[in-house]
Amino acid sequence: MTVSIYLVKGRDKALRRRHPWIFSRGIEKMDGKPQLGETVEIYSNSGEWLARGAFSPQSQIRARVWTFDKNEAIDKDFFVRKLNQAQGLRDILAEREGLTGYRLIAAESDGLPGITIDRYQNYFVCQLLSAGAEANKDQLVEALIECYPDCNIYERSDVSVRKKEGLKQRTGVLHGEEPPESVIIEENGVKISVDIVNGHKTGFYLDQRDSRERSCKYVKDKSVLNCFSYTGGFGLYALKGGAKHVINADVSQLALDNAKNNTEINGFDLSKAEFLNADVFKLLREYRDNGTKFDVVIMDPPKFAESKNQLVGACRGYKDINMLAMQILNPGGTLLTYSCSGLMDTGLFQKIVADAALDAKRTVQFIERFEQAADHPLDSAYPEGFYLKGFACRVI
């Protein structure tokens, strides 16, 4: 028997604008007891059918919408249609930018709530972040196999957000072969080695591709400090752009070893690159205190705010780290700074950087704005899909 959800009167406005989330406080009643991730019918308070979605009894987001079409079933064919639709955009990007690695499915922004799929050559790496995604895993895998008959599918659902959905963390092969230690992808003429099994997220930060390419114009004949370098993405583009010297700083020796390997496979001059195992906050203070200066500092830290109650602390962290970066820049130098915290909007991030400039006693000009790459699209009904923002700043 299909379970039906009825919304509180007046709580259907966002849904009518095709926002895909229904919060627990918006539900008036339910006919039946849905299981974890079960597909349910969603009605207005007066009984008008509105959508079909996945139920999550433990999450504040109690249901995520699969479809607003009453005649559309949630089956393998549904996922095939969504995959083909998403591939259309990625084909354009792959041809234009020479990509062999990209985000194929960006969750709600591609009409598949809680599902992220990154493609590295013929390896499809899935993160299933919601109860509905988990419940429909088999159909999703079948759809991937139909669309990409020679694919290898690997799961990287080792993320803490699954706990909020009542799910355990999972990793492993879903179809085909185990990924090798290194899968080489290419973007904008740069080769990048990706560790699918042990790397951050699904192996690489694909969302910064456009920012990496645009950073090249700031680095020619410059000294560059690449903070939170991971496997060297920005550092590789700095060498591509003609940097005089690049220091890649990260706390993970494994990531730094991969960064060095990436430098070698691109044929860049290793004498121009340095790989420093260090805590970035401590390193910046050391550079400030001993008078070390750079022409360009790239600041791409991990997410500082996972929830609203962490936002105040995150603001302090972003301000401190940007202040330190400004203090070690030569006059007229460039700060490329980013935030991937979705809870921090662009205006707030800009204010934080401005406040950091005051504390650093430096004048800052915002000269360029950055955001996530086009394979991480923003659906018009889902503004929460925008999370990555950044600035190029001239520091005087």
UniProtKB/Swiss-Prot annotation:
Protein name stated in the entry: Ribosomal RNA large subunit methyltransferase I
PROSITE patterns: PUA
GO molecular function: RNA binding; rRNA (cytosine) methyltransferase activity
Gene from which this protein is expressed: rlmI
Catalytic activity: cytidine(1962) in 23S rRNA + S-adenosyl-L-methionine = 5-methylcytidine(1962) in 23S rRNA + S-adenosyl-L-homocysteine + H(+)
First-level EC class: transferase
Keyword Transcription: no
Annotated PUA domain residues: 2-81
Compartments it resides in: Cytoplasm
CDD domains on file: AdoMet_MTases (cd02440), PUA_RlmI (cd21153), RlmI_M_like (cd11572)
Entry-linked InterPro entries: PUA, PUA-like_sf, PUA_sf, RLMI, RlmI-like_PUA, SAM-dep_methyl-trfase, SAM-dependent_MTases_sf
Keyword line: Cytoplasm, Methyltransferase, RNA-binding, rRNA processing, S-adenosyl-L-methionine, Transferase
Family: Belongs to the methyltransferase superfamily. RlmI family.
Function description: Specifically methylates the cytosine at position 1962 (m5C1962) of 23S rRNA.
EC code: 2.1.1.191
PANTHER family (alphabetical): RIBOSOMAL RNA LARGE SUBUNIT METHYLTRANSFERASE, S-ADENOSYLMETHIONINE-DEPENDENT METHYLTRANSFERASE DOMAIN-CONTAINING PROTEIN
Gene3D superfamilies (alphabetical): PUA domain, RNA methyltransferase domain (HRMD) like, Vaccinia Virus protein VP39
GO (cellular component) term, any one: cytoplasm
Pfam family, one: Methyltrans_SAM
Source organism of this protein record: Aliivibrio salmonicida (strain LFI1238)
